[in-house]
Amino acid sequence: MKILIPTAKEMNTDLPSIEAIPLKPESQAVLDALALYSASQLESFYKVSAEKAAEEFQNIQALKRQTAQHYPALKLFDGLMYRNIKRDKLTEAEQDYLENHVFITSALYGVVPVLSPMAPHRLDFLMKLKVAGKTLKSHWKAAYDETLKKEEVIFSLLSSEFETVFSKEIRAKMVTLKFMEDRGGQLKIHSTISKKARGAFLTALIENQVQTVGEARRLNFAGFVYREDLSQPQGLVFVKEV
């Protein structure tokens, strides 16, 4: 069983660094393609300010020179979902669960264990980077599939941009999650609800050592409960009354 989570734009580097590990060939090819961009080219590539582009340029070049600081990915990323995940004061069982079951999908690093060392970087599958003439999705598809081909249960907390990197065969095994609020009988969904709830759901998986879809359906977390009437076998819906 694997749980897939996305990367985040927000990062926190106010952390103890950890030792880097060598990049996979697929990752090195992506880095080599990124490293060809000048700071001014990155400004339009990322659609960011000149100041931000200069910072990203330094991050890329540090990775290229193998001088970049690395941090556990789960703690480096600091978006709303990540801030709602239990990341500290884990029991030994919770730590083991994280290491064995939770994986981050990255456009630079591939599908990697959640505590893997990562350096600060900015890249997602909506960005039009060509790697040896291929799109990022095409470049990564085989490696992404290889990571999950033996898994029977895959919980996906990914957005569609990440899910579509995988083949249809792998996507058919994914259990997707939807989180909604019930406001006086009106069901609402928006990104803030979803991001917070993904983090809370993952925390519930970790704390309850969930291994099956049946166990996930029984979870009650942050006010969310499973709604069978709204769910599909491969698509679980959790609703919070507010």
From Swiss-Prot:
GO BP: response to hydroperoxide
InterPro entries: YaaA
Signal peptide: none
One of the record's GO cellular component terms: cytosol
Family: Belongs to the UPF0246 family.
Xref: NCBIfam families: PRK02101.1-4
Protein name: UPF0246 protein SPP_1571
